[in-house]
Amino acid sequence: CLGVLQHTPNTLDSIKELNRVLKRGGFLIIDHYKHHIGHYLSLYLVYWYLIKNLPKSIQAKVTNFLTRAFFPIHWHFRKNKIIQYILRRISPISFYYGIFELSKEQHFEWSMLDTHDKNTDYYKRHYTTKKFNSLLKQNFNFASCKVYERGNGLECIAIK
């Protein structure tokens, strides 16, 4: 169940329901946004608050417009670490150059998708690795459970 939990009203309740329908010996693979100090040192939450409060009928148009406007700037300065550092603090888009080996077109598509995803979600929860591990250990008795920091946050592979 990837890319879903952070978009539900309650992460713990959602994992409990997944666990309820999981057979013994079955794999539970989930992910969740990770808490990152950068969320508070950028305009990320400001953009999110403004965009999520727009009518749903125009949210995609707004995030697509922002991606089309900011992506060329990010791409032009993609190899300049200082400007990228600044852009990542003021730009509303997701940009993954240097993280994933993708073509320019693929980078644009990922930016378009993730810019919409991060700016229009109704619920905004992030976990630290420690708190996510604690949530899982205190509430579940998995035969095996491991949390990894990768992707866009935290990934968990557990066996019931």
What do the predicted segments below correspond to?
Residues 100-160:
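C-terminal lobe and adjacent flexible extensions of AdoMet/dcAdoMet transferase-like proteins
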Residues 1-9:
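A short SAM/SAH-binding and catalytic strip from SAM-dependent methyltransferases
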Residues 27-74:
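Conserved class I S-adenosyl-L-methionine
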Residues 8, 36-41, 154-156:
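Short catalytic/ligand-binding loop motif for oxyanion handling, primarily in non-cytosolic enzymes
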